[in-house]
UniProtKB/Swiss-Prot annotation:
Superkingdom: Bacteria
Annotated GO CC locations: cytosol; riboflavin synthase complex
Residues the record lists as binding (2S)-2-hydroxy-3-oxobutyl phosphate: 87-88, 129
GO BP field: riboflavin biosynthetic process
Record GO terms (molecular function): 6,7-dimethyl-8-ribityllumazine synthase activity
Keywords, alphabetical: Riboflavin biosynthesis, Transferase
Pathway involvement of the protein, from the record: Cofactor biosynthesis; riboflavin biosynthesis; riboflavin from 2-hydroxy-3-oxobutyl phosphate and 5-amino-6-(D-ribitylamino)uracil: step 1/2
Record's catalysed reaction(s): (2S)-2-hydroxy-3-oxobutyl phosphate + 5-amino-6-(D-ribitylamino)uracil = 6,7-dimethyl-8-(1-D-ribityl)lumazine + phosphate + 2 H2O + H(+)
Top EC group: transferase
Chain's gene name: ribH
Keyword Transferase: yes
Function summary: Catalyzes the formation of 6,7-dimethyl-8-ribityllumazine by condensation of 5-amino-6-(D-ribitylamino)uracil with 3,4-dihydroxy-2-butanone 4-phosphate. This is the penultimate step in the biosynthesis of riboflavin.
Name under which the protein is recorded: 6,7-dimethyl-8-ribityllumazine synthase
Length: 166
């Protein structure tokens, strides 16, 4: 049996990417943003095709992502933040709710969202992960934007095939 295969496509040329960055734990979030934007540029996403907005913290990220999705202006989005464990249940609440909100927005609007919210035990762990996570999010956003576009084009081909049968 033959199987089709769609290879990873990391060509960011012409893609419009939105980034929502939390300001809480600002030094970590600034490093995440710097790494993400630098990687987007390496992948061919033009600076003017990237919009960065900031929100107070991780719990506010899903709403900003939702508003960006509603605009219809973005091929993919990136969520950047850092949640550092404390001595209360708040860590679990923020981690779980922000992650669930991000997933829901992406599925509701069929827009790829790379989740770059670090959930760590210490500030040191957060700083150690910023470069790699920022780059990974840029790559995931570009790859998924291209994959979604390719899969959407299959639906268009099916519609054309049905028209040909008539």
């Amino acid at each position: 049996m033959d199987h089709g295969f769609y290879p990873s496509n990391l060509d960011g040329e012409g893609l419009r990417i939105g980034i929502v960055q939390a300001r809480f734990n600002e030094p970590v979030c600034a490093e995440l943003l710097e790494a993400c934007v630098a990687e987007l540029e390496k992948l061919g996403v033009e600076g003017e095709d990237t919009l960065v907005v900031t929100v107070p913290g991780a719990l506010e990220i899903p709403l900003a992502l939702q508003k960006m999705c509603e605009s219809g202006q973005f091929d993919a989005l990136v969520a950047l933040g850092a949640v550092v464990r404390g001595e209360t249940y708040h860590f679990e609440l923020v981690s779980n709710e922000s992650g669930a909100g991000i997933t829901r927005v992406g599925l509701d609007f069929n827009v790829p969202i790379a989740n770059g919210i670090l959930t760590v035990d210490t500030d040191e762990q957060a700083h150690a992960r910023t470069r790699e996570k920022g780059r990974d999010c840029a790559r995931a956003a570009v790859e998924m934007a291209n994959l979604v576009a390719a899969l959407d084009s299959l639906r268009g081909q099916e519609d054309e095939d049905e028209d040909d049968d008539e």
